[in-house]
Structures are given as C-alpha cells and as structure tokens.
Amino acid sequence: MAQLADGRPKDSGQMGLAARYYAGEIGTEFGAYLVNYHQRIPSLSLVKTPSGFDNSIFNGLAVAGQNVVNPLSYFFDYSQENIQVAGFSAATELFGYSVFGELSYTKDYPVSYNTVDLIKGSATGDGPLARYGDASQFPMGSVLQGYKPLDKIQAQVSTIALFPRRLGASQLAVVGELGAQMWRGIGDPLTGDRFGRSPAFGAGSH
C-alpha cells in the first residue's frame, strides 16, 4: 500500500484550565482541571484508492473483469479533534507515605481498531470491519477511519515512600500505583469491533 500525507487536526481550539486548593486543616491538596485537545498519537487509517491510481500497489486480483480485493492506501491519522477531559485529584500524607489519587472522565478519545481487522475488512469485506469493504457504503475515494471515538472513566491511586540510607544508597524510594479504566461503547470482541489487539494474533473470525 502507498503512504499518503498524514491526517492533521486544526491548529486552534486546544485549551486547558486548572485550579488547586490546599486544605491545611487536613493537610490535603485538592485539584480540578478541564482540558480540550486534539489527537496526539496517530491511528492507521485507509483510503480506497481508485484502481487506476498508480500510487497504490494494492490493486487487487481480477476475476471476470472485476476486482475482488479493494485497492487501498494508508496514512497516519491525527485528525480527531476536541478530546475533552475533566478530572479531580487529591494529594496528602498518611502514616509517612505520600498518597495521591485522580479521577477523570475523557470524552471522544480515539481508540484504534485492530489493524488486521481494518485492512482485511477494507480490502475483502470480511471480518468485524466488513462494512468498510461495502462499495455502497464506502465507494472508491472514501476515507476508512481507523479508530472510533469512545468515552472512558479512569481512576488511580499512587503512593511514594522514602527511606534514607538503605541498601547502600543514600535514599530508597518505593512507589506503588493502582488504576482502573471503564470504557463505554467497547462492546463484545467476539461479536463486534475489536480494539487495540496486537496484529500478531491475526484477524477476527466473525
């Protein structure tokens, strides 16, 4: 497949706002923030390249004069705009340990499809992303988006403890972290779209 120019978001519209408050009576700092930003980590997206377009070598096989594999080109896609994050944090000290936690909600984060499913579905019309191979929905020249905007809630708690003069060092730091994410719209990977799975494990069978 030929590589096309990267898909880029607009240059404007990114902003953030944060506030902090230290509650001295309980020795805890509280924080809150709001962020609106554009995609920073690219997804792999495809374009159905017309079969006579020479910059794609993925021109398919011909049977009875018809292509049985859709010709494709690819590009690195940074185009998701207005990813919104709202978060709340707290930091304190308990029993000599520094403890801090954060709870955040992210809206419209671009989650990449399994790349094997994406290419197979777009080229042959098979697998979880078979819709991308449907010429009635996605004719030649269509952009086949390699991600889906999804919402998530993330919570994490971390701690740091410092011990002077341990194990021959001037200071030993012990760090621990516990976190969890809950996504909305992921669905069942056995029957629907699949996200983030390594392409080394092949394509979906459904």
Residues covered by each model-derived region:
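Transmembrane beta-strands of outer-membrane beta-barrel pores
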Residues: A23, L34-R40, L94-G96, Y105-Y109, ...
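Substrate-recognition/cap regions that form aromatic- and gly/pro-loop-enriched pockets
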Residues: L150, Q156-H206
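Residues that define the transmembrane beta-barrel architecture of outer-membrane proteins
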Residues: D11-M15, N82-A86, P149-A155, H206
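Residues on the lipid-exposed face of transmembrane beta-strands in outer-membrane beta-barrel proteins
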Residues: L17-Y21, A32, F88-T92, G101, ...
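Short loop/turn motifs that connect adjacent beta-strands in outer-membrane beta-barrel proteins
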Residues: Y22-E29, E93-G96, P164-V174
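Solvent-exposed loop segments that connect transmembrane elements
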Residues: M1-Q3, P42-F75, Y113-L144, G185-S205
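Transmembrane beta-strands of outer-membrane beta-barrel proteins
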Residues: T28-F30, S43, V99-G101, V157, ...
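Aromatic- and glycine-enriched pocket-lining scaffold segments that form the walls
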Residues: M1-P42, L46, F88
